[in-house]
Amino acid sequence: MLFSSITFLYYFLPVTLFLYYAVPDKLKNLILFLASLIFYFWGEPKYSVLLLFSVLSGYCGGRCIEMVKKKKSGVKESKGRTDRVVLAFFISFTLALLIIFKYLDFGIFSINLLTGANLPLFTLALPLGISFYTFQIISYYVDVYRGDVLAEHNFIDFAAYVTMFPQLIAGPIVRFRSIQKELGQRSITFEKISDGAGRFVCGLCKKVLVADNLGMLVSYLEKADEGHWILAIAYTLQLYYDFSGYSDMAIGLGKMLGFTFPENFDHPFISKSITEFWRRWHMTLGGWFRDYVYIPLGGSRCGMLRWCFHMFVVWFLSGLWHGAGWNFVLWGVYFGILLSLEKLIGNTKLFQKESFKTAGKICGHLYVLFAVLISFIIFRVENLNDIGPQILALFRGHGDISAAVAYEIKSYTVLILLSCIGATPFLRDVWNRLKGTAFWEKSGWLLQTVLIVAGLLLSTAYLLGSSAHPFLYFRF
């Protein structure tokens, strides 16, 4: 079931919210869990059992890790490694499910490619959301092991955490420790519901009115094999509005349910370095790899060569997380190289001079935009043999663009320009300034209501005239 579908907007969500608000607080997590199962079953019935199995194993894993740690509390450290073994077992077991369903065919394909063998593929469909809920469960294991959180003893509460429909399919990656208190007790106010509805509709408009329309231009230009610069820009904007739109919708739904989810995007295209870009793009994934891979490896507290190895591991895995394909691995390694080069260059005395810092601010934006455009060509093109020609096409003249392609591009000019403006903090800053005015004190609620209703109706009108498009990150 898609957030951007009539079924979700006018059937599932109203019924779920009505029941959720109507029942006593002690039953809210049960309603949330059952609603999330229906939500998942609607779109992925054959893998619903896998989701439930993952929930059960995650619950048992947390309890076992906590139990072993309590037994170990009176044992000398040198003799007590049982908790590490238990942690490793449950992490390995949880990862095994992800590897089987997401990477098994990719591994067989790679072996066939390298050795000339003809091993049969299993052609397993990718379960929706498995990359996201697997990472949430692993973070829960590690946090229980570290003592950052207590293992959840209430199965329904834990199940509600893992399966929570707002963020189940495509994030944000919500850590248990960030919402553990809210799982037990949370307040639901009119202000939270109103703010959540506004955030949800904002994300809906991003998805339906911007990302889906840009997607049609991307599909057209891919077939036409012309206008490669516009294609690269349109796809980058489509991916941003599609994924940030989903994140906005998830955060808004979470707020309507009384939860505070972490932010996932913070205007990444205003960044002046790739390092800054990845602090603003898919922030919950970057934070996950930092806390559960990069820092445990040793982080930056080592020599430069060792640090480069840490970066390679993190970005190789990050690329692989995004998809079972060598283009995704290449995409991850590409960013790992850029980030390593930024640190190497930034550490030299020459580039620490004030004159170079000033020049960096001027050129940084252009560098980031160009590097990101190139990266998403690698991301989009699945065949490795086609990546080079697609990038070279940006710099190779093709003569005049055909009249049909030129007309198509012109018809999207306003949308692309508005999308570029919307990707900056401009609209956010205008909105925040408006909130500080006397007009807002008097009529802000009315303006907010009008915008929410208008955005919902406009998106609905568009959905009625076309089929709902799946979110791009569903395939990851």
What annotation goes with each model-predicted range?
Residues 1-475:
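Membrane-embedded transmembrane alpha-helical bundles that form the catalytic cores
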